[in-house]
Amino acid sequence: MAETDARVNFDLPATLRKWPSLNNERLKEGRSAYLVFEGTLDECIKEYKTKPESSRHLYEIHTAPQPPLVTETLLGEHIVELARLRDFL
């Protein structure tokens, strides 16, 4: 599939999760990301964008993969790029 043929369904279910942190640093040992918001991919992207930029590295979005543009777990810059794509469409 050519990149120009790629489509993203922003209406698919998704969850926004946040990693526990201390002093804005992710705690890794024995911890997992917890649910912050549940909705569509579009709603989770919007919710992510409301978070302070200084703490966005602690968040991730989980959704059904949509190759080649959407992976099961979306992080930082990937979320921002999808938001730009959504705004472009």
Predicted regions and their residues:
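Short loop-to-beta-strand transition segments
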Residues: R56-H62
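A cross-kingdom feature marking charged/low-complexity
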Residues: A2-T15, A64-L89
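Short aromatic-glycine-(Arg/Gly/Cys) micro-motifs in beta-strand/loop hairpins
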Residues: D5-S32
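Short secondary-structure boundary/capping segments within folded domains
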Residues: R7, L35, K49-E53
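A short, charged, amphipathic alpha-helix used as a generic interaction element across diverse proteins
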Residues: T40-S54
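A short, exposed loop/beta-hairpin motif centered on an aromatic-Gly-Thr core
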Residues: R31-G39
